[in-house]
């Protein structure tokens, strides 16, 4: 669902997030030289430096480290056809992008909260945030009622309907052996 909020991706906003993550990584690497990138770190390592770095840097690093695990969880869940876990991790990603990495906006959070309230399996920010779209994992039986409700409630709150782009899971990209 497209909020129709234009991405105002101020490079300075992304630069601040990158700097936060680099700072957290540098503090972790000082104690764990094997850590070259934040993706090499664990939450245990991050917790070891929590008093050494600003709270904002901690939150942003927490999102990045958590997101790495969520991606791995989703890969495993997809191989097993476990869409409930996929959906749970999607909601976790949205929470992290909104509350920890701070790249969501009111409209995206509204659609995510509405999806959860409507029983949608999963929902998250799509792309870089600061506006744009959510992607939603919706069971076929809920699809029509969710779209109708989302359009009505979003319009009542923001004065316009979100755009809806239908996609269907397919055998698209896959591992070749």
What are these model-derived regions, one by one?
Residues 131-137:
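Short beta-strand->loop micro-motif that forms the acidic, two-metal-ion catalytic signature
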Residues 2-122, 137-177:
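C-terminal nucleotide
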């Amino acid at each position: 669902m497209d909020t129709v909020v234009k991405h105002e991706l101020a490079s300075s906003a992304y630069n601040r997030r990158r700097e936060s993550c680099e700072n957290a990584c540098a503090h972790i690497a000082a104690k764990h030289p094997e850590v070259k990138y934040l993706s090499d770190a664990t939450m245990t390592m991050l917790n070891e430096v929590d008093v050494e770095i600003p709270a904002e840097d901690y939150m942003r690093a927490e999102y990045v480290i958590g997101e790495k695990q969520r991606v791995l969880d989703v890969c495993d869940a997809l191989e097993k056809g476990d869409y409930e876990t996929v959906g749970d991790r999607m909601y976790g990603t949205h929470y992290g992008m909104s509350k920890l990495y701070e790249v969501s906006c009111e409209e995206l959070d509204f659609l995510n909260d509405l999806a959860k309230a409507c029983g949608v399996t999963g929902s998250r920010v799509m792309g870089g945030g600061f506006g744009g779209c959510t992607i939603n994992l919706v069971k076929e039986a809920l699809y029509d009622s969710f779209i109708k409700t989302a359009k009505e409630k979003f319009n009542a709150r923001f004065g316009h309907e979100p755009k809806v782009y239908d996609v269907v899971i397919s055998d698209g990209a896959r591992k070749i052996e």
